[in-house]
């Protein structure tokens, strides 16, 4: 079983509106500070977080106790101008766990499976066409992956540059996810007891593919 936590910043929209129309520079700085705190506190306990809209955050928490999750949320909330709450979901896949957030259930004892994907030759494409062209292609790819993940039980997130992270239900799921993707990509897949360690292994696998100039998938367990 996989475990997913969704963190909500309570009253965040109301806080932003209270700042008046000349507010965006403040909001962007605060969001950056909160995101840094979320990454710091969740990875410290072995979880793997990401943002939703910046007033919601998600984390894969396989193998991470509820007490450690609470501690991570409390630490991250110190960077927020409003309070934070969270729900925990458990399911056969990360996406199912997300849909069941707040529904209770047992522990998430399955190994965490995480993918780190990049687009091949994006650096050369950026030199040729500028960064906007590659950015739009990656955003389109993210949308395609997000729709496929609804059926396959995964979740996809934009990391920046040409990089995408995926919470996977199993290592083999990546092959079904990539079926039909029209961009050339390389993907490292990591498997570990805790999600952040799985992501580290995925990144290590991706770096191996890059160094060898190969595309495709490499799995590290």
Swiss-Prot record:
Coiled coil: none annotated. Keywords: GTP-binding, Hydrolase, Nucleotide-binding. GO terms for molecular function: GTP binding; GTP cyclohydrolase IIa activity. It catalyses: GTP + 3 H2O = 2-amino-5-formylamino-6-(5-phospho-D-ribosylamino)pyrimidin-4(3H)-one + 2 phosphate + 2 H(+). It is an enzyme of class 3 (hydrolase). Its EC number is 3.5.4.29. The keyword Nucleotide-binding applies. GO terms for biological process: biosynthetic process. InterPro entries: GTP_CycHdrlase_3 (IPR007839), Nucleotide_cyclase (IPR029787), Rev_trsase/Diguanyl_cyclase (IPR043128). Catalyzes the formation of 2-amino-5-formylamino-6-ribofuranosylamino-4(3H)-pyrimidinone ribonucleotide monophosphate and inorganic phosphate from GTP. Also has an independent pyrophosphate phosphohydrolase activity. Belongs to the archaeal-type GTP cyclohydrolase family. HAMAP family: GTP_cyclohydro_3. PANTHER family: GTP CYCLOHYDROLASE III (PTHR42202:SF1). This is GTP cyclohydrolase III. The gene is gch3.
């Amino acid at each position: 079983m996989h475990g997913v936590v969704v963190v909500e910043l309570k009253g965040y929209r109301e806080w932003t509106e209270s700042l008046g129309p000349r507010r965006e520079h403040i909001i962007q700085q605060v969001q950056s500070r909160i995101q840094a705190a979320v990454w710091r506190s969740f990875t410290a306990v072995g979880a793997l977080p990401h943002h939703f809209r910046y007033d919601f955050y998600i984390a894969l928490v396989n193998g991470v106790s509820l007490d450690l999750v609470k501690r991570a949320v409390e630490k991250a909330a110190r960077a927020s101008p409003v309070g934070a709450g969270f729900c925990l979901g458990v399911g056969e896949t990360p996406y199912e766990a997300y849909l069941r957030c707040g529904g209770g259930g047992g522990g998430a004892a399955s190994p965490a499976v995480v993918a780190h994907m990049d687009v091949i030759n994006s650096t050369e494409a950026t030199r040729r066409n500028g960064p906007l062209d590659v950015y739009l292609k990656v955003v389109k790819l993210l949308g395609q992956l997000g729709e496929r993940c609804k059926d396959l039980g995964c979740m996809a997130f934009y990391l920046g540059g040409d990089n995408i992270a995926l919470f996977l239900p199993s290592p083999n799921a990546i092959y079904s996810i990539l079926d039909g993707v029209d961009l050339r990509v390389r993907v490292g897949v990591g498997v570990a007891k805790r999600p952040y360690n799985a992501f580290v292994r995925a990144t290590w696998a991706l770096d191996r593919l890059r160094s060898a100039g190969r595309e495709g998938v490499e799995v590290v367990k």
